Design a protein with these regions (language model features):
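Histidine-centered divalent-metal-coordination microenvironment in nucleic-acid enzymes
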Residues: 17, 132-145, 318-325
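Loop-rich catalytic cores of soluble enzymes, especially ATP-dependent carboxylate-amine ligases
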Residues: 109-127, 134, 143-310, 322
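Beta-strand elements of well-folded, non-transmembrane domains
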Residues: 20-22, 60, 144-148, 325-327
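Short conserved micro-motifs at the rims of enzyme active sites and ligand-binding pockets
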Residues: 29-31, 68, 101-102, 152-153, ...
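Short, well-structured alpha-helical interface segments that form or flank functional binding sites
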Residues: 13, 73, 135, 173, ...
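Terminal catalytic/cofactor-binding subdomain
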Residues: 1-125, 132-138, 166-176, 180-183
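Short alpha-helix boundary/capping segments
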Residues: 66, 162-166, 170, 333-341
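Substrate-recognition/cap regions that form aromatic- and gly/pro-loop-enriched pockets
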Residues: 312-313, 319-344
Length: 344
């Protein structure tokens, strides 16, 4: 099969986060709407850190048009099932916040899996604060078709590497290229140059300037979300925890090491308080997903698969690019031009 035909079979998926907000522009305090289904089981609409932070998930589809059609359909469904006085916030940086305690942590019910997901998020709040977790973004997922890999391997492979190893090696090469040139994404598509003053309430030292009575900004900024006030692991620089992208084995080993290494600061938080779990553990990373990065190799998960175990056993299924801001000027926060640029 010609390469051009193989590329048309590649799959694209979009995950988009967004806050539910009340009529006065503040973060919604209501439970996850029943009309949106179970946040634990609905594959298309779930929640992220907060009960108010929705996450929309498309299927892996061929081409930008199909993905945008499905993302639009999910948006329309949400609009019809939100409480009457609520809206879906169209930007990455959050709406009016009234302190850490005013950001409700997502509730997934009383099952073991549901409780684990809630405790993990409580741990994020205790470690980094809830305000940072209220930031929303778009994740672009991309996978090459098996036909592409077969054709590509026939052309360039000069070793006896098995097909899984071949795919893993080249997916990791792709992630390294994204890390090397990924600055271009927020430069071209950054859409979070301003932030509500309420977001900065806990930041006593910052270099943002006043835009108006309610807004701060940074001259020439494109993406505050990807900057110092956005997503970060405060322990990374201090503890030297950086994912190693040299190979899939190195990547898995580096994250597992962080998941097994206790952190003194997190030990001070403790595991339980008044009988309630405060975090899953006191290690630098509670789970692999706690490591924030602009790009991650991801496995195809089934059931209750653990990500690192699935990566090790099954290999890389797709690449997740996490540095896209939500564009508030676009109907669903992203358009065909952006998707095709990322695919190229």
């Amino acid at each position: 099969m010609p390469f051009k035909a193989c590329l048309k079979a590649n799959l694209i998926g979009i995950e988009k986060e967004g806050l539910r907000v009340s009529g006065d522009g503040s973060i919604a305090q209501t439970p996850h709407p029943e009309g949106l289904g179970s946040a634990l089981k609905n594959p298309a609409i779930t929640t992220d850190f907060s009960e108010a932070l929705l996450e929309l998930v498309t299927q892996p589809l061929k081409g930008a048009d199909q993905v945008l059609d499905e993302l639009t359909t999910i948006h329309n469904y949400i609009y019809h099932h939100l409480p009457e006085n609520e809206r879906f916030w169209p930007a990455s940086m959050p709406c009016i916040l009234r302190g850490q305690t005013n950001i409700p942590i997502a509730n997934y019910g009383s099952s073991n899996l549901g409780m684990m997901k809630t405790v993990y998020r409580r741990g994020l709040s205790n470690r980094y604060g809830s305000v940072m977790q209220a930031i929303a973004g778009i994740h672009f997922n991309y996978s090459f078709s098996l036909e592409f890999w077969q054709s590509y391997r026939e052309v360039i492979s000069k070793t006896d590497t098995d097909s899984k190893g071949f795919m893993d090696d080249h997916y990791m090469g792709l992630t390294r290229n994204v890390l090397r040139y990924g600055w271009l994404i927020p430069y071209l598509f950054g859409a979070s140059a301003t932030v509500c003053k309420s977001f900065m309430h806990d930041y006593h030292d910052h270099n943002l300037e006043e835009f108006d009575d309610n807004t701060l900004y940074l001259p020439y900024a494109t993406s505050l979300r990807m900057g110092d006030i956005g997503y970060q692991n405060s322990q990374e620089d201090e503890k030297g925890v950086k994912a190693n992208y040299n190979s899939l084995c190195h990547y898995i080993f580096s994250l597992r090491a962080a998941m097994k290494t206790s952190c003194e600061d997190f030990e001070k938080i403790g595991l339980k308080k008044n009988g309630e779990y405060q975090q899953l553990n006191t290690n630098i990373l509670q789970i692999a997903n706690e490591y924030y990065s602009s790009v991650r190799p991801k496995p195809i998960l089934y059931g209750n698969d653990r990500p690192l175990r699935a990566l090790n056993n099954k290999g890389i299924g797709y690449i997740e690019i996490r540095s896209l801001d939500i564009n508030p000027m676009l109907e669903v926060g992203i358009d065909k031009e952006q998707i095709e640029f990322l695919e190229a």
